[in-house]
Amino acid sequence: MRTLLLSACAAAFVNLAHGQAVVQPPKTWTTCAACHAAQGAASIGPPLASVVGRKAGSSPGFGYSRAMKNAQITWDDKSLAAFLSDPQQAVPGNRMPFAGVTDPGEVAELVKYLKTLR
């Protein structure tokens, strides 16, 4: 019975269509989701699927600011954390109207979540 219960719990966290673990977004994601889609087309902001490893300002179909297009950043843990903490300091002149996430734990959770978006 114990094995059955553990198996059922594990199955609840697996996306069977893709064979990947389903990761719940952190609470702070709701702020991001007001402008960004996790999957699909650009909205007010660019979609964030596969953002990790992507060059800043390069998602097709989104009109980035000159500052973001010219930023010499490839998004990784460190650059995402810096940008999420203070977007204007990380990329001066970008158009994201967001002051940043002040809690380092929340920033870490957002970066962890962004790494799951494919």
What kind of feature is each model-predicted range?
Residues 24, 69, 96-99:
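Generic anion/oxyanion-binding catalytic loop in active/binding sites
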Residues 10, 14-21:
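Boundary at the C-terminal end of the N-terminal hydrophobic targeting segment
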Residues 8, 61-63, 91:
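Short, basic/glycine-rich phosphate-binding loops at helix/coil junctions
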Residues 11, 32, 55, 87, ...:
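Alpha-helix boundary/capping residues
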Residues 1-4:
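Positively charged n-region of N-terminal signal peptides that target proteins for export
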Residues 37-76:
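Gly/Gly-Pro-rich "capping" loops immediately C-terminal to redox-active cysteine motifs
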Residues 20-43, 48:
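Sequence/structural segment immediately N-terminal to covalent heme-attachment motifs in c-type
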Residues 76-118:
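C-terminal capping alpha-helices of c-type cytochrome domains
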